[in-house]
C-alpha cells in the first residue's frame, strides 16, 4: 500500500494502559495517520465521533489487572469499570477489536497491520 492510499484516519481507543500510544507510534512508522481518542475520560458516549470522526476505529481491550500493572495505576476495579462503560459506544462501533492482555506490542501491531491490509487496500 502506498502512502497515498494510507490517507484515511485511524482512531485508536481503549482503556488506560491498553497500548494506544504504542500502537499509534508503530502505525505512524508504517505511514498511517492515527489519532488517540481519549474517550475513556468523556461522559459523552459519542464524543469520539464528534471530535475525531475516524475512517477506521480500532479498540484495544485491556483487563483491570493489566491496566494497573502496565501504567502503575492506583485504581480500584470500579474506576476501570467506569472507563469500560464510557468506552462501550466506541467499542460497539469499532472496526477491529484487539485484546491486548496476552499480546506484546509487536503482536498488537501485526494484528492491526493485517486487518488494515486486508480491508483498506
Language model: regions and residue ranges:
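Pre-Walker A (Motif I) flank of P-loop NTPase domains
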Residues: 5-9
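Hydrophobic anchor at the beta1->P-loop junction of P-loop NTPases
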Residues: 12
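Conserved substrate/cofactor phosphate-moiety recognition/catalytic segment
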Residues: 15, 25-55
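Conserved glycine(s) of the Walker
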Residues: 19
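Conserved Walker
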Residues: 22
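Conserved phosphate-donor/acceptor-positioning beta-strand/loop module used by diverse small-molecule
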Residues: 53-70, 98
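Small-molecule kinase domains that catalyze NTP-dependent phosphoryl transfer to phosphate-bearing small molecules
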Residues: 73-111
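C-terminal alpha-helix
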Residues: 111-119
Amino acid at each position: 500500500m502506498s502512502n497515498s492510499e494510507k490517507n484515511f484516519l485511524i482512531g485508536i481507543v481503549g482503556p488506560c494502559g491498553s497500548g494506544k500510544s504504542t500502537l499509534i507510534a508503530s502505525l505512524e512508522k508504517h505511514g498511517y495517520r492515527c489519532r488517540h481518542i481519549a474517550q475513556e475520560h468523556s461522559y459523552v458516549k459519542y464524543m469520539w465521533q464528534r471530535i475525531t470522526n475516524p475512517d477506521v476505529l480500532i479498540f484495544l481491550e485491556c483487563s483491570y489487572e493489566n491496566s494497573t500493572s502496565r501504567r502503575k495505576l492506583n485504581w480500584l476495579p470500579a474506576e476501570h469499570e467506569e472507563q469500560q462503560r464510557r468506552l462501550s459506544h466506541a467499542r460497539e462501533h469499532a472496526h477491529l477489536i484487539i485484546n491486548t492482555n496476552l499480546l506484546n506490542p509487536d503482536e498488537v501491531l501485526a494484528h492491526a497491520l493485517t486487518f488494515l491490509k486486508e480491508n483498506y487496500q
